[in-house]
């Protein structure tokens, strides 16, 4: 099947720990051939260097090396145009400098707005649950509008949680949540080349790495994740390109 150049990059990573996600809009990096593939390689090397340099100046904690295989990418935009590698590469130093660890609602709105293409509004969702005495947070953003069909299509969604859940289990939970949300919507029945939905854990809150689908903690988390994904999927449909009706 035909995909954007970032899809095989992400699939070949096989990393359970990802340290950075870079998203670009306006260019899908699809049907770009050798130039598109080499662009990702170049951007990855430069982003790796900039993030490692930032870590070397970190006064608050462990200084880590960020390798190119610690990175994943997403693209959305026009298909078949030359990928603007130089423009993106030259913007990386300033982009990395602006990275921050503290967050608020406006910060998330800015991120959701930055990935918009034909969307008319940013799409965000938030869920929280209590596990023991701890607050588990799940936050997600998405973009969509045109060409949304089952099995995703031109839709990107990035979900984040502080719960330190085993990566394989987290992947299973996301697949189950997506099956009745992102993979069950359509706007104009066309499928795209840049599908992506992913979930990240900051691992800040230890809930247990040896949990399974049968554990009540995981079942509680899964319900919240499914609710969040359905919320985002509905936002994508409601804001569909030219959409005037929402059928369920």
Please report, for each region that a protein language model flagged, where it lies by residue.
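Short beta-strand-to-turn element immediately C-terminal to the catalytic PLP-Schiff-base lysine
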Residues: 158-161, 198-202
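Flexible, glycine/charged-enriched surface loops at secondary-structure junctions
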Residues: 54-58, 65-70, 102-112, 126, ...
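Short, well-ordered amphipathic alpha-helical segments that serve as non-catalytic structural scaffolds
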Residues: 2-12, 39-52, 171-184, 223-233
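Glycine-rich, mobile lid/loop segments that gate access to catalytic sites or pores
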Residues: 49-52, 66-182
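Glycine-rich phosphate/pyrophosphate-binding loop regions near the starts of catalytic domains
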Residues: 1-45, 72, 147-170
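Short glycine/threonine-rich loop-to-helix capping motif typified by GTGT followed
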Residues: 34-36, 80-88, 201-213
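A glycine- and small/hydrophobic-rich beta-loop-beta segment
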Residues: 199-248
């Amino acid at each position: 099947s035909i995909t954007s150049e970032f899809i095989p990059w992400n699939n070949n990573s096989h990393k359970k720990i990802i340290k950075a996600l870079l998203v670009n809009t306006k260019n899908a990096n699809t049907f770009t051939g050798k130039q598109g593939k080499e662009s990702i390689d170049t951007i990855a090397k430069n982003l790796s260097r900039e993030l490692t340099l930032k870590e070397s100046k970190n006064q608050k904690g462990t200084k880590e090396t960020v390798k190119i295989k610690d990175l994943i990418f997403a693209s959305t935009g026009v298909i078949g145009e030359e990928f603007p590698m130089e423009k993106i590469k030259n913007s990386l130093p300033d982009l990395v400098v602006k990275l921050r660890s503290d967050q608020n609602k406006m910060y998330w709105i800015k991120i959701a707005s930055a990935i918009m293409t034909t969307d008319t509004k940013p799409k965000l969702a938030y869920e929280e649950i209590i596990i023991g005495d701890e607050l588990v947070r799940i936050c997600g953003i998405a973009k969509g509008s045109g060409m949304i069909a089952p099995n995703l299509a031109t839709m990107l969604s990035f979900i984040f949680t502080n719960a330190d859940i085993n990566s394989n289990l987290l992947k299973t939970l996301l697949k189950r949540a997506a099956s009745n949300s992102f993979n069950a919507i359509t706007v104009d029945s066309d499928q795209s080349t840049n599908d992506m939905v992913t979930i990240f854990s900051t691992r800040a809150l230890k809930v247990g790495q040896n949990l399974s689908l049968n554990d009540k903690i995981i079942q509680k988390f899964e319900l919240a994740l499914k609710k969040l994904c359905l919320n985002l999927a509905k936002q994508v449909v409601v804001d569909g390109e030219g959409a005037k009706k929402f059928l369920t």
